[in-house]
Amino acid sequence: VMTREDDVKFDSVRSPSVQKMRMAFDKDGNVTGMEQHVAAGWPTEVMAPYFMPKGEKDAPFDPFAINGANHWYTVGAHKVRAISNDLANATFRPGWLRSVGPGFTNWALESFIDEAAHKLKMDPVAFRLKLLTAEGANAGTAPNSVGGASRQANVVKIAAEKAGWGGQLPAGTGLGLATSFGQERDMTTWV
């Protein structure tokens, strides 16, 4: 068993990231497209570049720097762009200490979902549930992601109910909700 001290000596810190997101809506407020641009240090590029898969135009990319961008929300046309942060790569060796890519990717995504709900003047829980349709690719597959987006939607419903979502709050307080899944879509964890 590795202690936290051993872990800190063995691994490198997760890179900071900068993310830019945009969402398109039709005249009825339905989501028709989404872009997510993620600039971060690329651990695989620094440590083992020969393991990087090829993306568009045969350009290599580090999937560990954008894990989580292939989320369970139905957003129409979906574009994800991974940008290697050369400054981060040259300044320190980016790694996975204190979480892998979904740690920062899903934080940005969930914050953005709140912003989109606010723009549409929709309740953030209702907006999430509207996008977690479990249709097509978001239906999930056996044996790893059975239920897909419907399982994540169920987590949102249960969390909102247990938190008293929509109820009266004391003055000067607020309530937020975010959801996520494991490192990859085929992991069986929804939180």
Segment roles from a protein language model:
Residues 167-191:
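Non-catalytic terminal/interface segments that mediate subunit docking, oligomerization
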Residues 26-30, 36, 80, 114-122, ...:
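Generic secondary-structure signature for well-ordered alpha-helical cores
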Residues 16-111:
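Glycine-rich loop/linker segments at domain edges
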Residues 2-7, 54, 58, 170-179:
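Short Pro/Gly-enriched beta-strand edge/turn motifs at strand-loop
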Residues 8-19, 151-153, 158:
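Active-site-adjacent elements of ketosynthase-type condensing enzymes
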Residues 1, 51-70, 96-132, 137-145, ...:
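Alpha-helical support elements that line or immediately flank enzyme active sites
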Residues 2-12, 38-42, 133-137, 181-183:
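Acidic, glycine-rich active-site loops and adjacent beta-strand->loop/helix elements
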